[in-house]
């Protein structure tokens, strides 16, 4: 069964520092600049000490990857944060079962 939707996930330690504000500002700027109406971002709680900054709404892994490239390389964003592309289906399991570490090992 092929995934139908993908997300970009930026794992972050909680409570947040100014780097996270910087990341979320750049994501919001990108969403506004690109007029990406199908994409939205959120701050999702994962555990007491970890949260995910997430961009939702990609129709393919490739489109998520292409946005990640823009965020990393374009002069207006230049993000350095570690990010992962995950299917919505996998993300639900990761969140319900708190299995992000296991998911990382399976998706290197």
Q: Across the structure, where does each feature detected by a protein language model lie?
A:
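Acidic/polar low-complexity segments and flexible, solvent-exposed patches
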Residues: 1-108
